[in-house]
Amino acid sequence: MGGAERDLIRNIPFLSEKFSIKIATLDPVEELKSICEKMNFELLTPEKSWNVPKDPISIILDNDSSLNIWKNIEGLGEAIENSDFIHIVSGDGSMSIINLIPNSIPVHLHLLEPHRGLHEEVLHLKVNGQPKRNLGLTKLLLSRARKRDILQIKNFSSRKKSSISGNSKFTVSRIKEIYNLEVGLLWPSIDLADFIVEEEDSSLVELNGPYVVNIGRASWVKGTWETISMLENTNLSLVHIGGGEKEDLDLLNKHAKSCKVDVWFAPRLTQNELAIVMKNSRASVSLAHGEPFGLTPIEAFAIGTPAVYVNEGGFTDTIIDKENGRLIERHDLHSWHLALKEAEDVDIRAKWSEKGLERIEKLNLSCEMHAERIFKIYQQLING
């Protein structure tokens, strides 16, 4: 389950205090099904989950294929017609639902990132950074879809009773760069209660000795390969959380062996297990490329784990270097190793944890405030 899904799921109960809610998705995860069942929220889904396109030709048809699935979800049309407000969280296939929403209904789009498969090359690289196919040809094949994406976002922005927010200052700047639009800022959130370790399990991690944690589906964009490379000669192992394609995990295993880095690819973990693994780690690390916000730093703050991250993207919104964690230049290997050594120091860990919690408070990243911010967007749309 990705960070965006975790953020959405943790906010649903708090949104229900502001709105009577229904939830629609093309591919529900078990955690979403569970919370909807527990809280008696209507969950509108297709009979068969929509599969995310992976090759360039399928990506071109992404909008059309997902729209057909949205149209066939039983009860969705009626739910839309009866809505006072619709909040869309961007993701694969989500944008096409806009075509089904009458102009009379206020809509807010939380644009977590511009479509990276269309506007960047990083998603078209193998886990080791090599192109999956000729990048020039890929760019050419996707040119039509790229133009359509820009037009769709601009048309939505000009629609009456519509609003767009990015999830970080970095994302807001990327939206301006790609779509030439000035948009709002809606931070993600954190529920500190999710990171209280209920029961320790020392045998959970299948590694000996100290380790760092890297979260995110194994890929080049998440920096998995580079994280392993960085750990060479540190005597630190890696716990990777997020899974990946078998072919990619096999390549990463071979790479790890060549770097003499032990890696444990964790199975799907419960929230408590995730908290345990993070709590017992040397640090939470990431060399992700252009991460739009990245929930993992604030999750590290919440659990008291040092956050050591690449000095790029949305990580710079939450981490203040040497105050509540470290921001390291991608290729500065010496600084990475020094930071991981710092993360072992008890006093530094305590300081970064304290300052990290202060950062969460300063940005007001509580779920209650997230729901309040969305409610204010709704009020602005109906009164504007």
Region annotations inferred by a language model:
Residues 6-10, 210, 217-233:
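A conserved mid-protein helix/loop that constitutes part of the nucleotide-sugar donor-binding site
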Residues 25, 29-30, 215, 236-252, ...:
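Glycosyltransferase donor-sugar binding loop
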Residues 67-68, 335, 347-382:
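A charged, aromatic-enriched C-terminal amphipathic alpha-helix characteristic of glycosyltransferases
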Residues 77, 115, 127-164, 172:
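Membrane-proximal helix-turn-helix segments that form the acceptor-binding/catalytic region
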Residues 268, 276-281:
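Short alpha-helical donor nucleotide-sugar binding micro-motif in glycosyltransferases
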Residues 289:
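Aromatic "clamp/platform" in nucleotide-sugar-dependent glycosyltransferases that forms part
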Residues 306-310:
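Short hydrophobic beta-strand element within catalytic cores of glycosyltransferases
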Residues 321-322, 326-334, 340-347:
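Conserved acidic donor-binding segment of nucleotide-sugar-dependent glycosyltransferases
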